[in-house]
Amino acid sequence: MKSKWLLLLLWMCMVARPEAWGQEVKSANTVAEEWIQVNSSSATVLQWFEWIEKSTGIVLSYNPAQMELGELRRIEPGGKMTVEELLHRILSGYQVKIAFVPPRKLVVHARKIESYDVSGTVSEVDSEERLYGAVVTLEDKDGKQWNTISNGKGIFRLHVPEGTYTVKTSYMGYTPQVQSVRVTRDCFIRTRMKPLLFEIEEITVESGKRENELGELTPSNLLAFSGGDLFSQIWILPGVTSSLAGQNFMVDGGGYDENLLLLDGVPVFHPGHFSSLLPVFNGDAVKNMVFHKGFFPTPLEGRISSVTEVNLKEGNKKEHVRTLTLDMPAASVMLEGPIIKNKLSYMVGARRSWLDFFDSLLSEENRLNHSTYDYNAKLSYNFSPVTTLNFLAYGARDDYHLPLQENGENVSVLRWDNQAYQLSFATQKGRLGNSTAVFYSAHTNRAYMGEIKEDTDGYVHSGIKSLNVTTDFSYSLENLYHARWGVKYAYEVYDLVSQGEEMRVRYEPVNQVSVYYDNLLRISPEFSVQVGVHGVAYCPQHHRSYYSIQPRLSVKYFPSERNLLYLNFSKMEQFYHFLRFDSFSLPTDFRMPSIDGFKPRSSEHYEMGWKHFMNSGQCEVSVYYKTRRNVLALRPDTWVEDEGWQKYLMVGNGDSYGVKGYLYQRWKRWSLQLSYAYSRSREWFGELPEKGKVPSLYDVPHQLGGALSYQLTAHSSFSLGGMLRSGKVRFLNEDYEPLSVEEFREKREPLNYRVDVGYSYRKSFGDKLLLLRLGVYNVVGNPSEEDILSFYSVHWSGNCLPYGSLSFKF
């Protein structure tokens, strides 16, 4: 009987065992999902494991060889979470599997997640034109993002863990692109973007980060390419004062000669035209422009106030396209297309003034008496998506002529010439990139001596010729570190006019070698530091050599997603001085490299600011201080009569400081840009101790600019723009004579202000595109003499100036 009861008890235990195991499996979920309170803190992986075991009584089993137990991990934010969630956060960067062993044991299997390079190119879908500054974002299933921008060749690179990502690409004026990619090894992505309408639309200048873009990565003040004039938009940026077409602009209290213009990296000396309405370059051929001030990327040097990088189109690699433009100053044509489809393309543009053809129909006082033409040409060959070879040619000529011959025939009395040629090669091999270029640039200013000095004949000229070789390397280590270094060599020859009984030209050759190294370190997603140094050896063949060390520093911090704090420092040095004594640049003006005792001009620029990014815009406030050393000025009550410049010029120092604000906002069909700058620019000279610190010629205390546009229809818009600024300091009196010591830097021009209105119409007819622009400059206002010195006979009362432009692309 007793044995029967034992058998029955044994059978009941066997039947009940599966149920018991089922309860323990349920207990496994309970153990892994037990709640635990965690405070925000940092500890090693091993310390976190020990704390979990002590706090919960759970035994953790793991293979120490599979993970870095000494690696420091911070859990933030803290709070209530499950044990499983905490383990995944501790082992972020690992693929984690957790198995339960009763009664309270968790077996943790971890495998390090591999990371790979995701690289690619961003280009326009119809033309294969590479896009510089496109924002590329990779987003994983948890919403975590990795961001970068495409470089000057349209190439981008990101280092991300293996997995599936959504790739988002955005660029101003283009439809955003979204695609999915599975990353299991290094991969290459080609992104082709479609223009929203077509590329010859109105320009919007944005002073830094745009919606959903990278404040710490995007080039400062990037302007998208357009058929309009890019330079005419610079004046909307705070601290920038310029004429109608952006010529002769001043930046943060600096002079006209303190700004450098680069065309595809080639310096264009003394850019500009006789007509202040004519843009510096043919806008139909321009792809984009980047305007640097305050902080200068380490590879840049040569001027102390600003550097403007203008990049030309490479040409359509898929189909032949023609663009014809007729506006008030000039008529232009631009041709582009493939020579070898998807491989070799051409771009040729030419422009010429046309109102001068009607001079014979006008009275002598209303004639233009000048003509302008320029051309751009470019060949681009793609060996591969990341390897390109480009050839560039640029030329411009402005000619001012008068009927001086007895038979009434016109004689050229002033001519400006610019030339630039470049052969460049760029490639990318893994994380290492290289760009190498050879280029030649020249500027000549020629004048008829009979108009400069009585009883003389013939021509005199001044100029600069420059032959350069550059090579630039870049290296990216994951997403944390980016290095850039390079070497530049320049051989320059200056043609300088020597005045006296006879005018003659002397030649001064100069060798210059530059080396630079730049580091960008992203310490965290919120904090980045960029530090670099540029060294220059300036070696004239017949004069003293100079050596310069120019450090650069930029610190940026995002305290929140919508706010950016930044601190910038740049030391710059320029080895060229230029003083203009008339309304026009003449060969007899003071042009001098750092020879004959004229030391290089140097500057340190300090700036700190705050940017706030809104859903449909941004605002920015910054303060700056800039030093200026070895500045030159014409002595009071002085006329230049010969080549002894030391008798007429005095050397001093200066500084400038100010506060700047900028606002950009969109509301449905409305778009507003507003900028204001309060700045002071001072100079002091040892020869005038009694004057102390006086305003510089570039002191403009108050500068206010604004632009408001309204989208009337899908094809048309109306715009209203204006500026108000303090009058500039005078250096001549009302009779155009030099001021005395007592009046030196004491008088100003009146307050300048101007209101402009404009209308634009855009329409596509199949594959044909049309842009019409109409407007009036200075509807009301009091512009400066420089602004109205346009040499056009089409003026209304009060210096009101109409303009119009018609572009047709087919």
Q: Where do the model's predicted regions map?
A:
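Gram-negative outer-membrane beta-barrel transporters
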Residues: 625-627, 649-734
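Outer membrane beta-barrel strand-and-loop segments of large Gram-negative receptors
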Residues: 460-472, 506-516, 599, 618-675, ...
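Periplasmic N-terminal accessory/gating domains of Gram-negative outer-membrane beta-barrel systems
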Residues: 91, 151, 175, 190, ...
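Flexible loop and strand-edge segments within Gram-negative outer membrane beta-barrel domains
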Residues: 355-357, 387-466, 500-508, 586-587
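Short, acidic Ser/Thr/Gly-rich low-complexity loop/linker segments typical of extracellular
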Residues: 139-155, 159
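Outer-membrane beta-barrel signature, preferentially recognizing the C-terminal barrel domain
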Residues: 236, 408-425, 563-564, 571-629, ...
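C-terminal beta-signal and adjacent terminal beta-strands/loops
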Residues: 629, 724-736, 754, 759-810
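Short, acidic, small-residue-rich periplasmic hinge/interaction motif at the N-terminus
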Residues: 23-27, 49, 94, 101-141, ...
